[in-house]
Amino acid sequence: MSWEIVIGLEVHVQLNTASKLFSGSKLSTGAEPNTQASLVDLGLPGTLPVVNREAVRKAALFGLAIDADICRHSVFERKNYFYPDLPKGYQTTQLAEPIVGAGTVEIQLDNGEKKSIRIHHAHLEEDAGKSLHEDFHGMTGIDLNRAGTPLIEIVSEPDMANAEEAVAFARKLHAIVTSIGICDGDMSQGNMRFDVNISVRKPGEPLGTRTETKNLNSFRFMEKAIALEVERQIDVLEDGGEIVQETRLYNGDTHTARSMRSKEDANDYRYFPCPDLLPVAITDADIEELKAAMPELPDSRKARFTNDYQLSEYDADLLSGSIATAAFFEAAAKSGGDAKLAANWVMGELAAKLNAEEKSITDSPVSAEQLGQLIARLKDGTISSKIAKQVFEACWAGEGNPDEIIEAKGLKQMSDTGELEKIVDDIIANNAAQADDYRNSDDAKKKKKIGFFVGQAMKATQGKANPQQLNKLLQEKLQ
């Protein structure tokens, strides 16, 4: 029985301003609990909020990056609800007139297919505090350092049909907000958090009842949480049950989800305009200034990589998604003199090592310049591909630059044709039966059987033989 999956995302992006949205309190990761909360953040009587100009600028910059309408008369409202980490009893946010209107984000899937995901709007709002459950012996502690932190909440239309599309959309948003410099993008620190709205239906039927899975902070968890919730909803419906509109919480450690509460509608929050804040006015001059300051966007960077470096669209898409990865690749390509080799090494050996040790590219023990030097030695024939991997491992371990490692370990390819010719003659003489078998084979079989002699020669030279030179010699000698 076929089912259609319908997915929409709400993405909370923490803006990297110096201070909070409505107060002068500093934004500080790792500070002692409740040391970065001002009287304004606590909502004490007599305090008045003041809008952070830089937060408004960053929100509008995001809107321009997705080609959205920018509201010239944006209004803040109070969203009323009670929760222990919400000291004021309301959240200052936007509903009727958000700062960013409708826009679009284009994603590319693994099969090369492209799809446009519509953005309904993005609004500015303040974050709540944080509940602390450890070390309180049956009680919950409240840390209000995060209260008042500036966020933009990006609300998509329900345009995604599977987990792959949702993750691709989330990754693209991450690439955009980090590229334009409005968010640090550290998922482990909660710089981006994803709420996923999911429903299923039979083809042609109206939208089903949706659930919301909250506060996913990694792309991997998002993919797993979507698969889990889709399976749950289909099982419920196929058993004759009904989906309850609710908010659910996913546990990445156990790959389980539980119901948190029934899902509210906007009316339940009794929104009304914030009486303490004037509307935010954005002028044509403000917009033109932001457009002039717009950094390179991921799609523009991708196009440049395909045009300037002749990379495939797939490779360019992977390398342009992260500004740090893009910068590393370009530096390595410039240093090594070969963009394609640089792309292969960044996406291959380097990415594998970083993933294995759970490091980001900014923490790579091998610098872009060192990788470029390795590529240059590979390109000029100083070392073979096999030896290059050995040099890379030594460089990763901190044994020096590639040139130093190659020299210290004697890893240069054999450039003496006479010496290599003698080794080839010895191998053929010591393997006469295999040589005769090769000579009596057709061309197709010869291509396979010559591999035996190549392997023997590489073993004899400890991998230092030039593969092209070796193949040519073997073909001549085995005639």
UniProtKB/Swiss-Prot annotation:
Entry GO MF terms: asparaginyl-tRNA synthase (glutamine-hydrolyzing) activity; ATP binding; glutaminyl-tRNA synthase (glutamine-hydrolyzing) activity
Keyword Ligase: yes
Pfam assignment, any one: GatB_Yqey
Name of the top EC class for this enzyme: ligase
Record text on subunit structure and interactions: Heterotrimer of A, B and C subunits.
NCBIfam families xrefs: gatB (TIGR00133), PRK05477.1-2 (NF004012), PRK05477.1-4 (NF004014), PRK05477.1-5 (NF004015)
Name listed for the protein in its UniProt record: Aspartyl/glutamyl-tRNA(Asn/Gln) amidotransferase subunit B
Lineage, uppermost ranks: Bacteria, Pseudomonadati, Pseudomonadota, Gammaproteobacteria, Oceanospirillales
